Design a protein with these regions (language model features):
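Eukaryotic scaffold repeat domains enriched in small/polar residues
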Residues: 39-337
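N-terminal secretory signal peptides
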Residues: 1-17, 27-34
């Protein structure tokens, strides 16, 4: 493998991000835990680290060239299994299922800050970039053409159609759109399938239906809304199918143990009633059933294949292979379940 190949791993190029606020929060909290796949397995904290053979693919290293990253923040996967990754340079890069770089582009503005979320909206066949510090949701064609007419937001404020720092976009099977923001208000918004404001809920706090940086959203087969309430270190499950939202369950609590969470920045729903959660603070991924019972866990703090450094986002492809944004290591790792 050549040094200019995006899959080449040069240990000297792998840097460790050391944010001060998370140094103190997560110091000493990471256990060495093994991969058992998303099926029931031993969860001993003395389990051996994830073997490198369990890592199916590694994409990227630190840099500005095509196929390299500077602190990747979000990713999305299209129905054709093209992978899109955005980093702190505001670059969107597209890769095929083998990790080959295909194309890239930048968001229109980035001086105020970079996007922290991204999803592929199958209803409109478009890539949604959550342009956090410009208070908007940008829609692109798969080849990178900006669809101005579909943009949601763009103005900072508290009126309908205005946002704080936006974090994620999710669409229910009936077309309903859910949007999240953090900052002054920490709220979730409900929009029609056509992008018209319906309602909003939440405020900053730690009570049910309150949030502290709701970073990741998902909607299950029943239409229930799942929220990674990251700075409250929990997952909230909400029924908002009618006019008034209702809490269904709250999963997790802060801590380093299996079944606990430390800054869960991303989650995704799997088949067989399973849930994947990546933890920025514990440098790992957990698989739970949808009642919050742990099934498996993998990842240790580090820079070797299978280790993680502040994972920011995750997604699954059509084969339910798991892609993890290993932000502090400037790469994306793919794991097979």
């Amino acid at each position: 493998m050549q040094r200019n190949d995006p899959l080449y791993l040069n240990p000297s190029d792998r840097t460790v991000c050391r944010r001060r606020f998370l140094q103190s929060a997560s110091a000493g909290l990471v256990s060495a835990l093994g991969l058992g796949g998303c099926v029931p397995s031993s969860l001993d904290s003395d389990a051996s680290p994830l073997p490198s053979s369990s890592v199916d693919l590694i994409i990227g290293q630190r840099g500005l060239a095509d196929g390299r990253f500077q602190k990747p923040r979000a990713l999305a996967i299209s129905p054709s299994d093209e992978l899109y990754v955005i980093d702190k340079t505001a670059r969107v890069q597209a890769f095929d299922a083998n990790g080959k770089f295909l194309r890239g582009w930048k968001t229109p503005q980035w001086a105020n800050g970079k996007p922290t979320g991204m999803t592929f909206d199958t209803k409109t066949n478009s890539l949604v970039v959550v342009d956090t510090h410009y208070f908007q949701f940008l829609f692109y064609t798969p080849d990178g053409q900006l669809l101005e007419s579909r943009k949601i937001g763009g103005v900072n404020g508290t009126e309908p159609g205005q946002f704080g720092w936006v974090t994620d976009f999710a669409r229910a099977a009936d077309g309903t759109i859910y949007l999240s923001e953090y900052g002054e208000y920490d709220r979730i918004y409900k929009y029609s399938a056509d992008g018209e404001f319906i309602d909003r809920m939440g405020q900053h706090g730690d009570a049910p239906l309150e949030f502290s940086r709701p970073q990741s959203l998902a909607v299950d087969e029943q239409g229930l809304l799942w929220v990674a309430d990251s700075c409250n270190h929990r997952i909230q499950v909400i029924d908002w199918r009618e006019s008034q939202p209702r809490i269904v369950s709250i999963l997790g609590q802060q801590g380093p143990q299996v079944g606990q969470l430390q800054f869960p920045y991303a989650m995704t729903l799997l088949s067989k009633d399973r849930l994947l959660v990546s933890e920025y603070g514990n440098h790992r991924v957990q698989c739970w059933d949808r009642q919050g019972n742990p099934l498996s866990v993998w990842g240790t703090a580090g820079k070797e294949p299978g280790q993680l450094n502040q994972p920011w986002a995750l997604a699954i492809d059509a084969l339910e292979r798991v892609y993890v944004v290993d932000s502090g290591n400037n790469r994306v790792q793919r794991f097979t379940l």
